[in-house]
């Protein structure tokens, strides 16, 4: 009788182990990726479209792409939420960092960060 229980347990054990979930795979929908495809991640207190800032951009010698944002008073963010680099304003990905007067970052795109 004991040998039948032992054999049944030995046969069932590999089946149970093979059906166990393993770590890794695809991230769930709540995973936040704080990575820019192009450029660097910044926290900008103000963003303006170039049509609102053409006069200021021309005076400061800053060339901006049409449709992109200009970032004002920006600070770099290494990883959101780590090391005290939290962004109370709008996090943006910027292609160029040119410190020409008031404009800190050029060609910025806002990113959505749901924490």
UniProtKB/Swiss-Prot annotation:
Disulfide bond residue pairs: 36-93, 43-87, 44-74, 94-108
Signal sequence region: 1-19
PROSITE patterns assigned: HYDROPHOBIN
Pfam families assigned to the protein according to its UniProt record, in alphabetical order: Hydrophobin
Record GO terms (molecular function): structural constituent of cell wall
Subcellular location as annotated: Secreted; Secreted, Cell wall
Entry's Gene Ontology cellular component terms: extracellular region; fungal-type cell wall
Main location: secreted
Subunit structure: Self-assembles to form functional amyloid fibrils called rodlets. Self-assembly into fibrillar rodlets occurs spontaneously at hydrophobic:hydrophilic interfaces and the rodlets further associate laterally to form amphipathic monolayers.
Function per UniProt: Aerial growth, conidiation, and dispersal of filamentous fungi in the environment rely upon a capability of their secreting small amphipathic proteins called hydrophobins (HPBs) with low sequence identity. Class I can self-assemble into an outermost layer of rodlet bundles on aerial cell surfaces, conferring cellular hydrophobicity that supports fungal growth, development and dispersal; whereas Class II form highly ordered films at water-air interfaces through intermolecular interactions but contribute nothing to the rodlet structure.
Family that this chain belongs to: Belongs to the fungal hydrophobin family.
Name of the protein: Class I hydrophobin C
Upper classification of the organism: Eukaryota, Fungi, Dikarya, Basidiomycota, Agaricomycotina
Name of the gene: hypC
